[in-house]
Amino acid sequence: MPFFAVAFPVFDPVAVAIGPFAIRWYALAYIAGIVIGWLYARMLLQRQRLWGGPSPISLEAFDDFILWVTIGIILGGRTGYVLFYNLDFFIRHPAEIFELWKGGMSFHGGFMGCVAAVVLFGWKRKVPILSLGDITCAVGPIGLFLGRIANFINGELWGRPADASVPWAMVFPNAGPLPRHPSQLYEAGLEGIGLFVILALMIRAGALKRPGLIIGAFLTFYGLARITGEFFREPDPQLGFLWGDMTMGMLLSIPMVIVGILVMITTWRRGRGAPAAATPSSEAAS
């Protein structure tokens, strides 16, 4: 074990307090991620050269979609946590499923909620589902980055014990005396910054002209980033390791990589093809 460890900074769990009303860091991360992602998506939708013509999604339609995807993230994230990470506990205490302020969200569940929101909104509003999925995935790393930073501020989801070769190891307040990897920051870099850069470069190279390509890339590279981060992250105590060093996060991410690769191959072979949908003016009238 290392002879020296970086002191974990002390943060107030409440980010903003106005009288009796308080917003915690994790909630603030969700709010900021949605707002910044919405602004970034609007910027992409207005750049016709990225789409090879007018965007197949109007700004008005995307503004309406934000509420749908927000609900999908929250419901899916909570449902995923209940089913994948702590089902036995919630079977015994079902009322606590609704106590979101106590924490407990799953990315994989939130992603499935996003998929449901994209499909349902696209079907209802006659918006091209693949293009809507592409733009949603393009902004996803923003929320992932902010969420992992909030995990770090809260001193939760810490890493595995580190050895002397890791001078930046930290002793987390609720994780015992051993210095540990700040795995939340690793994941913020991999799932947030790294994934955002990859997708942004692909978009700049014309990926939005091939509907579904960004979806496939997101699935693939997020899955790889999450699997890598899991090697440094302490598994959830109620689950532990499943098989050898396999964790629940790895188990849920492996199918993402496989599906993502298949989607990218299929999309690339299909080529650009026909325009994804009607112009924004015709879509807005639907």
Swiss-Prot record:
An example Gene Ontology biological process: lipoprotein biosynthetic process
Main location: membrane
Superkingdom per UniProt: Bacteria
E.C. numbers: 2.5.1.145
Topology in the lipid bilayer: Multi-pass membrane protein
Residues binding a 1,2-diacyl-sn-glycero-3-phospho-(1'-sn-glycerol), per UniProt: 148
Keywords from the UniProt entry: Cell inner membrane, Cell membrane, Membrane, Transferase, Transmembrane, Transmembrane helix
Annotated localization: Cell inner membrane
Alphabetized GO MF terms: phosphatidylglycerol-prolipoprotein diacylglyceryl transferase activity
Catalytic class of the enzyme: transferase
Pathway where this protein functions: Protein modification; lipoprotein biosynthesis (diacylglyceryl transfer)
Pfam families attached to this UniProt entry: LGT
Transmembrane intervals: 25-45, 65-85, 103-123, 127-147, 188-208, 212-232, 248-268
InterPro entries reported in the protein's UniProt record: Lgt (IPR001640)
GO cellular component, one term: plasma membrane
Function: Catalyzes the transfer of the diacylglyceryl group from phosphatidylglycerol to the sulfhydryl group of the N-terminal cysteine of a prolipoprotein, the first step in the formation of mature lipoproteins.
Family: Belongs to the Lgt family.
Protein known as: Phosphatidylglycerol--prolipoprotein diacylglyceryl transferase
